[in-house]
Amino acid sequence: MELLRTVDAMQAQADAARAEGQTLALVPTLGALHEGHLALVRRALNEADHVTVSVFVNPTQFGPGEDYDDYPRDLEGDRETLEALDVDAMFAPSVEEMYPYADDEALPGPLAWVDVERLDEHLCGAYREGHFRGVTTVVTKLFHACKPDVAVFGRKDAQQYVILQRLVEDLLFDIEIVGVPTVREPDGLAQSSRNEYLDPEEREQATVLYAAVTAAEEAIEGGEQAAEGVVGAMENELAAAPDADVQYAEVVDAHTLQPVDHLVPGQEVLAAVAVFFGETRLIDNTFVQVPPAQA
């Protein structure tokens, strides 16, 4: 496996692989790799001949007061993990490499952004101003640097997954977006690099997120057609955790990410929650197909 630190080196390797007739896959990550990331890598290895994993803690997707400075970083550990999986390249650029004009005194950048509108109005986007603009901008840069045929993302970050699908469609990228189901701990908690912030009591209570989205799925599959009823089922589960500070519990259309009041048979919806335990913010969700109306 090659460790590549510059865009030029990454593009050169991608061009060489393409010249050999290989298909290319990209797995973008923030690093601090866990089993959830490795599921994405394994999927990429099945999708393409040549796999690149990017490791880059992107500053533009973190807002004021968020955990950019404290976000876990373990470049050498990530390198060893990826080498063991026979990944072809690890692309780990510096901030200066990805945002070359950030410190330009005359005209500091970036001046060019990629922004997918409307899809960031609810869920996480309503509370993390500028987050998804940072995500779509850096992913566009990674697409240009790594030149993939396939890009693999986790469906745990459901809003991001839907937004990136629309990004590729609207900007005519010849790239397939592949979504991988959420990887969970044995007790259901979605795997996340931020789980390590939790103290033992918070970690025990954090399972209410999975309980909440499971309750939403059961309510919908059981015939509940009022979004209010589904949200109520989630809130009942979240209330079992005394230290949980619920940011949102919502049901939206899975494609438009707009809120729904009444669930329509055949519609795909997304039930999602975001919860703080102290300073640690966790998310979870489930995509659910609304069943046919019962006769």
Curated annotation (Swiss-Prot):
Keyword match ATP-binding: yes
Lineage: Bacteria, Pseudomonadati, Rhodothermota, Rhodothermia, Rhodothermales
Binding site for beta-alanine: Q61
Record EC number: 6.3.2.1
A molecular-function term among this protein's GO annotations: ATP binding
Misc remark: The reaction proceeds by a bi uni uni bi ping pong mechanism.
Protein's pathway: Cofactor biosynthesis; (R)-pantothenate biosynthesis; (R)-pantothenate from (R)-pantoate and beta-alanine: step 1/1
Record-stated family: Belongs to the pantothenate synthetase family.
Chain ranges passing through the membrane: none
Gene Ontology biological-process annotations: pantothenate biosynthetic process
Binding site for (R)-pantoate: Q61, Q160
Complexes and interactors: Homodimer.
Binding site for ATP: G154, R155, K156, D157, V183, Q191, S192, S193, R194
Keyword Cytoplasm: yes
Reaction catalyzed: (R)-pantoate + beta-alanine + ATP = (R)-pantothenate + AMP + diphosphate + H(+)
InterPro entries: Cyt_trans-like (IPR004821), Pantoate_ligase (IPR003721), Pantoate_ligase_C (IPR042176), Rossmann-like_a/b/a_fold (IPR014729)
Location within or outside the cell: Cytoplasm
Residues forming the catalytic site: H37
Function: Catalyzes the condensation of pantoate with beta-alanine in an ATP-dependent reaction via a pantoyl-adenylate intermediate.
GO cellular component terms given for this protein: cytosol
Signal peptide: none
Official protein name in the record: Pantothenate synthetase
Entry keywords, A to Z: ATP-binding, Cytoplasm, Ligase, Nucleotide-binding, Pantothenate biosynthesis
Gene3D superfamilies documented for this protein: HUPs (3.40.50.620), Pantoate-beta-alanine ligase, C-terminal domain (3.30.1300.10)
